[in-house]
Curated annotation (Swiss-Prot):
Main location: secreted
Species annotation: Homo sapiens
Domain Ig-like C2-type per the UniProt entry, residue ranges: 292-376
Disulfide bonds: C158-C191, C162-C196, C173-C181, C313-C359
Gene expressing this chain: CILP2
Signal peptide segment: 1-20
Record protein name field: Cartilage intermediate layer protein 2
SUPFAM superfamilies: Carboxypeptidase regulatory domain-like, Immunoglobulin, TSP-1 type 1 repeat
Tissue occurrence: Expressed in articular chondrocytes but not in knee meniscal cartilage cells. Localizes to the intermediate to deep zone of articular cartilage.
UniProt cross-references to InterPro entries, sorted A to Z: CarboxyPept-like_regulatory, CILP-1/2_8th, CILP-1/2_b-sand_dom2, CILP-1/2_C, CILP-1/2_dom, CILP1/CILP2, Ig-like_dom, Ig-like_dom_sf
Amino acid sequence: MASLLPLLCLCVVAAHLAGARDATPTEEPMATALGLERRSVYTGQPSPALEDWEEASEWTSWFNVDHPGGDGDFESLAAIRFYYGPARVCPRPLALEARTTDWALPSAVGERVHLNPTRGFWCLNREQPRGRRCSNYHVRFRCPLEASWGAWGPWGPCSGSCGPGRRLRRRHCPSPAGDACPGRPLEAQKCVRPRCPGCSLDTCECPDHILLGSVVTPSGQPLLGARVSLRDQPGTVATSDAHGTFRVPGVCADSRANIRAQMDGFSAGEAQAQANGSISVVTIILDKLEKPYLVKHPESRVREAGQNVTFCCKASGTPMPKKYSWFHNGTLLDRRAHGYGAHLELRGLRPDQAGIYHCKAWNEAGAVRSGTARLTVLAPGQPACDPRPREYLIKLPEDCGQPGSGPAYLDVGLCPDTRCPSLAGSSPRCGDASSRCCSVRRLERREIHCPGYVLPVKVVAECGCQKCLPPRGLVRGRVVAADSGEPLRFARILLGQEPIGFTAYQGDFTIEVPPSTQRLVVTFVDPSGEFMDAVRVLPFDPRGAGVYHEVKAMRKKAPVILHTSQSNTIPLGELEDEAPLGELVLPSGAFRRADGKPYSGPVEARVTFVDPRDLTSAASAPSDLRFVDSDGELAPLRTYGMFSVDLRAPGSAEQLQVGPVAVRVAASQIHMPGHVEALKLWSLNPETGLWEEESGFRREGSSGPRVRREERVFLVGNVEIRERRLFNLDVPERRRCFVKVRAYANDKFTPSEQVEGVVVTLVNLEPAPGFSANPRAWGRFDSAVTGPNGACLPAFCDADRPDAYTALVTATLGGEELEPAPSLPRPLPATVGVTQPYLDRLGYRRTDHDDPAFKRNGFRINLAKPRPGDPAEANGPVYPWRSLRECQGAPVTASHFRFARVEADKYEYNVVPFREGTPASWTGDLLAWWPNPQEFRACFLKVKIQGPQEYMVRSHNAGGSHPRTRGQLYGLRDARSVRDPERPGTSAACVEFKCSGMLFDQRQVDRTLVTIMPQGSCRRVAVNGLLRDYLTRHPPPVPAEDPAAFSMLAPLDPLGHNYGVYTVTDQSPRLAKEIAIGRCFDGSSDGFSREMKADAGTAVTFQCREPPAGRPSLFQRLLESPATALGDIRREMSEAAQAQARASGPLRTRRGRVRQ
């Protein structure tokens, strides 16, 4: 069946497309031959991302799932949701816009098309003018922003004329979609009228009547031992048996009694009996108690004094939490004074109400604490945005500095990344009606005089509050098998419990983080059933920058056959030279089907154990090892192993249940002091990604044949294997710290060149006795994403023994592994970033410290907690658990650990500066490298170089066809070629160029004039034939080319690896570039590699040779004397051509004689 899944997926998409093809234009109202329904957009008119619509709405990114062929071009909304996930397009779009890949509107190219926001777009070849076929279109949709409810109306009258009843009240959603507001429009409340006359349970008895009932879970699993009572009478009247049934005699069948059931670990349930003659029946469903978890956190707000603000908090759980408390700067706010529930509304704000707010939610199972939100209250006349820009240094090209003085920097200014007060600050909405932030109000053009040329630049002259796009977290990545690296194809993706899409053929996925999310819990379900469900908590950048993750799925163990008629034991842990950590004992006769009926016969069991004694298993371990403690805060766990249980009848897809199952853990495997007593058994809640306690452990000695010279001691716990299948042997740990890490663009560790979006992972290691660098096992792991001030990672630490806990720290950016500071021959404080004597106490060692042949992709340290009162340990890099804010706000001069990019031989220069890690810094300008702040298109050209060394290759990008930018510089890109490990003397460079397309005003297309120049004595020897033919067929041609360079007007189409061009479109510029570079290295349009394949998918080839000693480089010669340099190049090429002709002449003569 697994092999049929790809075919099934294709059939589903084909059905979606077929539905569009069969549609006729008369079925629903639609726009034809226009680019935008409801609003006519003609040639030359803009359709910018920020548009003044009546409704609060925004555009999605562009989609293109079909290419013209056959009947035409079909961009079905159903197919878009299938490929990209339902979360990428709202349920009811307001409008739709379509453009060709040349960015032209349908009316501009004279084609008849059909647009319908609820169905999509289609263009039929048979409807076009004679001799014309449909162009290739991409589409985007206009979606309403999240709407909010109005105030509740008054309560209605109590239902019924006597006895208990209920009353209702309603609220209105102002959105035109009606159901766009989250939650219910109706709320019910119990009410009581005077007692009804006649018989009641207290006064009436029916001795011949019988109440028959059952108590089950939502899945139909019967519950044994549930206590049953009548709602109006205290005391237990019955207890459910093994089949979940009970009977109560004497209950009148026509009394419609309310029956209540309770059971430990489950929420109370109630149902009304239904009469059937002298018998009444009832089924009571009990949900398992679940601690509350937050689905909506309060968000930071900026207001002016006198305005109002609303903070919102929403929790879920079983039962649903109804009690909320709000805190200001850690102090509980009076419920009566503020009248709050899940929402806290503050009116007429005063400056003293500024500060930190958070909420707590309760239910029967416990409490949970929300994240914090900061309220900033501005005094009258106080500006929210300082008009003076802050310092922001950009690096100028290497040939623009003074000789021998190092790189030169220029202050181009930046506006602080702060929010501004909402213009509708008095609205009772949870979210602000419009997003306003401090951004660029005015740019100034300046010129930088470099040796031999002038470099234009635009600097920030003034900041101000402007309308801005709300930040969107974006996560992209790839799911692969942990053992083989094969992609997990067409795996279902669940966000909590909601399906949002599938992985692609290469295992790729894209997830847009929902607003107000703090923990992104994602589950990947393998359709073949060969891999464990991969439950991951993926860190992301809430400011909107994209983050890339590689998710490793663990393959299930091979099945073993069990027999239900006998007890079965399955070992936990199968490492060589290591005893099992424990075992599962499944008793005989304990297996059941999902409906509770006993099962007998063979059982196919697959028990997969994640063994922390295998250090490589940390990469594929599920979740992030956290639970909610008694105070409602997230707390870490230290694991001794996780196991997944899959029980099925042979040849059946139905999962079997079993219980109680004994979990036996060898006490000799628990080495940390106090952990034997604290060990507990936990199960994973896949919706929240949090672990929940199942049972404790008790000591028990071995007996029978297990007795040896020394009696083995086991810790034994019990668990029911029902809906949840993933369990954990964990200990809550209170010795916690934070570790500060920063990432840099190169190993010079310049503060102004920090890299954001790097995923830093810390794995806690438990050392073997006497060997701090030789860990026995890993205990937990955590990841964080670097921001403008680095990242703080939680870890276990110890104040008394520095090596009680050690850690392995690694960092990745896309598919690139970063390198930490070296430790050979000894760690240097100025290089590592940590002052002495704390550095010696931490025992810093890079992974290649003992063996230079090892990879240099991480470092190990002792997690020595800073000692109070010691000034040398007061400023990092390890901070106490309660000092998170100090860690996050520490200046760059404070101690921290460092990583640097290995691929550091790159340089980027934009005429209009833009911080790719902060999408809010985008500025609308015709010379902006990225013209659209909602969609970033990265383009790369693969340049092959035949030469004895690696060479720097420059891309010069200027306006090519747009009348307002023609000849003006957009930016420069430098990239050093990378050697092909299998081809000596050959290297290749993946060089970025500015994509052609619409500029930011969306009025007219510009074909970027791109010039590629290697640095050195190089000449162009070959151009990809397909690329050359494409450029010939898409005029205008470029002017006469320099033989030492390659020039083109960049293509409008995303051509692909066959042309040597790599194009990726994404909502994050950083992710788009990382994915495109990975494909360029691999030489394919869907692969990913960090090993250069120089002969695969190249666009242009240069031949380079080493210049004579003392001869200046080509760049320098072109700057000093362009005419002389070009003359030298022509002469060298002529001499090379003559030498080649002389070498090939005799060969042609000999061939001619053979033919004679």
